[in-house]
Design a protein with these regions (language model features):
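Conserved metal-binding segment of the jelly-roll/cupin
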Residues: 208
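Catalytic-core "active-site belt" of small-molecule-metabolizing enzymes
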Residues: 1-197, 205
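Conserved RNP beta-strands of RNA recognition motif
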Residues: 200
Length: 208
């Protein structure tokens, strides 16, 4: 209840008990319970905790999924308010999925995942906690807090093309202080399409 209120009012709360974070299964249950109480349109599903090195370090087998709500979506050019609990920004790829996917009975694989994609585009995810002085110790820390999502800033969608995103270097520069941060798509669960494959199979399995 406290997390849901924090989500709805854009406020922060004292940390939830660590027992809900240590066990990823409990964290997933908490996330789903909280998501079910949000009276807002679900516009997408994201993969969270996709950093391969982080997963190995945390001894977790796979990432998690989380709902993306309409009120969390921001169009390119709009302002986003942040606070000390905002932890960063991530460059992402988003995909629009064809309706035919929901009638498909088989498993989504690396070889067939592209046939379900209609559009694609760039986006930024603003990540952070709704809890005071929260530290990232377990995967459940970010999973249980609405998947660590604060806002999604989406760019223009284009018709899907089979682009090679396996080794795409990115660079973010702060206009305020000139700090530059480099990244690469190859650290995110192999590549964006593999993350999508994971999400689509979870959607089918859990009937999201």
């Amino acid at each position: 209840g406290r997390l849901v209120k924090a989500f709805n009012t854009n406020t922060v709360i004292n940390p939830i008990p660590v027992k809900y974070c240590k066990n990823i299964n409990l964290a997933n249950k908490l996330r789903k319970l909280c998501e079910d109480q949000i009276k807002d349109e679900t516009i997408g599903i994201k993969a969270g905790g996709t950093g391969i090195q982080a997963l190995k370090k945390l001894k977790e087998k796979e990432p998690f999924t989380a709902k993306v709500f309409k009120k969390r979506l921001v169009k390119s050019g709009q302002k986003v308010k942040i606070n000390q609990h905002t932890k960063g920004i991530e460059v992402e790829v988003y995909y629009f999925i064809k309706k035919s996917f929901f009638d498909y009975k088989g498993k989504v694989t690396k070889s067939n995942v592209t046939k379900f994609i209609k559009f694609m585009g760039p986006c930024f995810e603003i990540v952070g906690f709704r809890q005071r002085n929260k530290k990232f110790t377990y995967l459940g820390d970010i999973c249980g807090d609405f998947g660590f999502n604060i806002k999604f800033v989406v760019g223009r969608k284009t018709k899907f093309k089979k682009l090679n995103l396996n080794n795409l270097k990115t660079s973010l520069v702060s206009k305020k202080n000139g700090v530059k941060v480099n990244g690469n798509t190859n650290i995110v669960y192999i590549n964006p399409l593999n993350s999508l494959r994971f999400v689509l199979n979870k959607v089918k399995k859990e009937k999201i």
